[in-house]
């Protein structure tokens, strides 16, 4: 991307992407008119450009994004990928992020790749044939490592409460952050847990190695930890490298409610920015300001509700701004988006219960 923005001969280029970490020069004011960022899920680096109207945001379920590409509702001219090196059979893989990248790579003729020696080789539906790559560059650089939010007393208490709701034989879905980490850190006395999730991070590694996560009782992808992407430390990336027990699938499969519901005792742990007294959950915006995106929360909340013995959980601290602002409110802020409807909410957990 850094090289792309230096091209002075390019005009009106639309860049469709999920969360981007690091440099986002393509969204700087001086490139307006040449490049247009279109976030399908966003983060800290692009909130300001979106708020100022220099970048676009599309509210969409993560599970619906692959169809945008495969049906050419969004016709892609080229895709930029970071891949693992090819094996003896000429198979590269999408590494840590299969999610929407698989559909994108299958839906365009031009694949531009960075083949990174440090990208782990992953299994599942991760293969990109080397022969399909139009142009590539080789690199040997560390992957981005996500910093873990520190666990405070509030997160610890929420983690204890949710861990108490997780039964032996449960199938887990969780995100990244202090609360999911706090939950996972308190599951070491459980047995035969399974993982079927949109993403996971470092704490799952410990549960697998200790034999807490076996995936033995899952009905879908039995014996396999299933995800669409991972983010965390080098330790996590080393764990998934050439690991046949971890399968990466496109997010229209991992987040398919019909598959999620087939697993037993699905515990879906999802967060919120605020929730009103009727149960409406805002998880993607602060008033009119876009904060992140819709993601897969609704898919897993609904899938867990349909699972036999499932527990769809919205977890959040009761307050923000060092206790000065309640996150449990009579009504959502003006402009706030509803990600999960009041009809889909079953369990809400704060530090008070």
Where are these regions (language model features)?
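Conserved alpha/beta enzyme-core scaffold
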Residues: 1-352
